[in-house]
């Protein structure tokens, strides 16, 4: 099962990604993690990425696609994968298609901007595992502590209101057009597209996802 998650930052993708990974036994592929791992491994692609990043430039779509292809060929992607944060633009989606990376489901998490601002400003994370909590909507069992390890939770610098609003503007300009792109792909029978009401409580969104993914 190959899945792409779409939705603005704070639409609930991270929380549901954890659920999808555990339920369906597929890894989450984040381009940031993938780039860091490639640089660390010292592979040919990793060296190219390091040179570009060291020069303060953005890694090209071609290089990211090559890394995605390399990553999804690994054993743990045998049953599929979950792509989060990629593709971000229509040229990236086109490049994926040209590279023969097919996707079974595109899930759009739909949440109004104001609710997103509320959600992000109250967000707390367990940095080592990536587990995400919220003081109001998804609190940990013990305030300020991770449920699994009991370690301290922190607030990301990115979770300040001004930063959040800037990211939402960027999302609407750059990534939102992918919604139309993948709707058309679904009409052509190339993928399945589903809109998920991300305003619902976590458990209800989870139940909706189970219905969609089976």
UniProtKB/Swiss-Prot annotation:
Q: What would you give as a GO molecular function for this chain, any one? A: adenylate kinase activity
Q: Does the keyword Transferase apply?
A: yes
Enzyme Commission identifier(s): 2.7.4.3
Q: Which gene encodes it?
A: adk
* Task performed by this protein: Catalyzes the reversible transfer of the terminal phosphate group between ATP and AMP. Plays an important role in cellular energy homeostasis and in adenine nucleotide metabolism.
Q: Which amino acid positions bind ATP, per UniProt? A: 10-15, 123, 132-133, 200
Q: Report quaternary structure and partners.
A: Monomer.
Q: Which reaction does it catalyse?
A: AMP + ATP = 2 ADP
Q: What is this protein called?
A: Adenylate kinase
List, alphabetically, the Pfam families matched. ADK (PF00406), ADK_lid (PF05191)
Q: Could you read off the lineage of the organism from its UniProt record?
A: Bacteria, Pseudomonadati, Pseudomonadota, Gammaproteobacteria, Enterobacterales
Membrane-spanning parts: none
Comment block on domains: Consists of three domains, a large central CORE domain and two small peripheral domains, NMPbind and LID, which undergo movements during catalysis. The LID domain closes over the site of phosphoryl transfer upon ATP binding. Assembling and dissambling the active center during each catalytic cycle provides an effective means to prevent ATP hydrolysis.
Q: Where in the cell is it found?
A: Cytoplasm
The entry's AMP-binding residues are 31, 36, 57-59, 85-88, 92, 156, 167
Keyword terms of this UniProt record = Acetylation, ATP-binding, Cytoplasm, Kinase, Nucleotide biosynthesis, Nucleotide-binding, Transferase
The residue range of the signal peptide is none
């Amino acid at each position: 099962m190959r899945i792409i998650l779409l939705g603005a930052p704070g639409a609930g993708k991270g929380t549901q990604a954890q659920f999808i990974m555990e339920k369906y036994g597929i890894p989450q592929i984040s381009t940031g993690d993938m780039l860091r791992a490639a640089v660390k491994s010292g592979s040919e692609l990793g060296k190219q990425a390091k040179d570009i990043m060291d020069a303060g430039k953005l890694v090209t779509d071609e290089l990211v696609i090559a890394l995605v292809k390399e990553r999804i060929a690994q054993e743990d992607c045998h049953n599929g994968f979950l792509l989060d944060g990629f593709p971000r633009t229509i040229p990236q989606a086109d490049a994926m298609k040209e590279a023969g990376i097919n996707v079974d489901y595109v899930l759009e998490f739909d949440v109004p901007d104001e609710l997103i601002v509320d959600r992000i400003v109250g967000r707390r994370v367990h940095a080592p595992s990536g587990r995400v909590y919220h003081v109001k909507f998804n609190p940990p069992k013990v305030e300020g502590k991770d449920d699994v390890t009991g370690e301290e939770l922190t607030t990301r610098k990115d979770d300040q209101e001004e930063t959040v609003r800037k990211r939402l503007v960027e999302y609407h300009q750059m990534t939102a057009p992918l919604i139309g792109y993948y709707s058309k792909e679904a009409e052509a029978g190339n993928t399945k597209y589903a809109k998920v009401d991300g305003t619902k409580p976590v458990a209800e969104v989870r139940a909706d996802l189970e219905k969609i993914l089976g």
